[in-house]
Amino acid sequence: MGRTVIVLGGGISGLAASYHLIRGPSPPKVILVEGSKRLGGWIRSIRGSDGAIFELGPRGIRPAGALGARTLLLVSELGLESEVLPVRGDHPAAQNRFLYVGGTLHPLPSGLRGLLRPSPPFSKPLFWAGLRELLKPRGKEPDETVHSFAQRRLGPEVASLAMDSLCRGVFAGNSRELSIRSCFPSLFQAEQTHRSILLGLLLGAGQSPQPDSSLIRQARAERWSQWSLRGGLEVLPQALHNHLASKGVTVLSGQPVCGLSLQPEGRWKVSLGDSSLEADHIISAIPASELSKLLPAEAAPLARILSTIKAVSVAVVNLQYRGACLPVQGFGHLVPSSEDPTVLGIVYDSVAFPEQDGNPPSLRVTVMLGGYWLQKLKAAGHQLSPELFQQQAQEAAATQLGLKEPPSHCLVHLHKNCIPQYTIGHWQKLDSAMQFLTAQRLPLTLAGASYEGVAVNDCIESGRQAAVAVLGTESNS
């Protein structure tokens, strides 16, 4: 009888793991278990009555690098090529990003000319920060905060404005707590290998082999900065779900796992309330802190490690305006914590993907609120209600973008514990977890955003790697 592998979690990581498990030469029986009623995790797209698409989670995927190429290959394999909406390299959403500082939108400098010119909010041309960086010695610590790393190598302004904002945009987190080694491994490795970030990025880490397809070649030729799908990004997990169902994968949704136990013969028993399943191996693609509550007593040391990987909550407010215009054209803007801790940034959805504006076309923007700073709002006595988030989002859109008329449509969603925080020393937690799994020969593989990347590409790759580890061979991709 063949092996049975249970995949916990029907987000994009669990779906990708299941997809690659069944592509091996001798695929196991795969059972995907999801606690909620829907699959796709944080990727969720809602279509308005006018046909406009509102993304409640991720809204674009980067095609760059080996991981970006692998995701595009997946899109082709699922037959979604005709649905792809690219943002080409010459598009304003690819070229223009802004910081909101001192009550003003400032374009981030790009290209050599931009680096040589004074570019507010920075007091000097960023060329000087780059020159300073080239002359700095290599750091000696095995890890440090993003803020400390950026301040040491690039100066206080880049640290407190650019890197602070970037951490808020990517992780909804505090650069003074997040780990440079785990959050931005390419920057950490560049310094370790070449003594300089700039030298490291220029010389590169060597080209890793990349998959090839007509879509990948097109993305490269047209220098895509990101892409989406015509019906919204949720089309991707939906297509994966349909593919899995067609290949005989058992998909159980609305089935929260109550506990995991090891049988005497080494198989897993997965308790689902009033029923249970058995498996030879488990791939866990649920958050680390959730898995820590399910593990049996034999895995208590692992549970303790996983319970320390925390996540923050983000309020996402989608706003739609009739007959309104943006003061600038670009991807969006970020807000450093020194300016407005509550507002992380605003994405200009209609600039990147006007095809999703509906009929008649409208202006769509998305305001991100909270993250690490949500706990401070709560501590200050604020009731974290949809009304509060809508008010804060509309005020931000009015103040920062001049959108003073009330929106014609508004969606408010609080995503609880949606973005894991790789705080300083995160790499040691991962090392300890892997050492425990290896030493105990536990038939458990970890995947998902809790470990080595929170972006969609990272999650898809973590699912693929988990499947490869279980199969003991590369899947057919």
UniProtKB/Swiss-Prot annotation:
Induction of synthesis: During erythroid differentiation.
InterPro entries: Amino_oxidase, FAD/NAD-bd_sf, Protoporphyrinogen_oxidase, Zeta_carotene_desat/Oxidored
Catalysed conversion reaction: protoporphyrinogen IX + 3 O2 = protoporphyrin IX + 3 H2O2
Means of activity regulation: Inhibited by acifluorfen.
Alphabetized GO MF terms: oxygen-dependent protoporphyrinogen oxidase activity
Recorded metabolic or biological pathway in which this protein acts: Porphyrin-containing compound metabolism; protoporphyrin-IX biosynthesis; protoporphyrin-IX from protoporphyrinogen-IX: step 1/1
EC class of the enzyme, as a word: oxidoreductase
Chain sites annotated for binding FAD: 9-14, 42, 57-60, 257, 449, 454-456
Note on how the cofactor is bound: Binds 1 FAD per subunit.
Keyword entries, A-Z: FAD, Flavoprotein, Heme biosynthesis, Membrane, Mitochondrion, Mitochondrion inner membrane, Oxidoreductase, Porphyrin biosynthesis
EC number: 1.3.3.4
GO cellular component, one term: mitochondrial membrane
Main localization, broad class: mitochondrion
SUPFAM superfamilies per the UniProt record, alphabetical: FAD-linked reductases, C-terminal domain (SSF54373), FAD/NAD(P)-binding domain (SSF51905)
Subcellular location: Mitochondrion inner membrane
Topology term for the membrane: Peripheral membrane protein
Pfam families: Amino_oxidase (PF01593)
Cofactor: FAD
Family to which this protein belongs: Belongs to the protoporphyrinogen/coproporphyrinogen oxidase family. Protoporphyrinogen oxidase subfamily.
Subunit structure and binding partners: Monomer. Homodimer.
Role according to the record: Catalyzes the 6-electron oxidation of protoporphyrinogen-IX to form protoporphyrin-IX.
Xref: NCBIfam families: proto_IX_ox
Protein name according to UniProt: Protoporphyrinogen oxidase
Organism of provenance: Mus musculus (Mouse)
Organism lineage: Eukaryota, Metazoa, Chordata, Craniata, Vertebrata
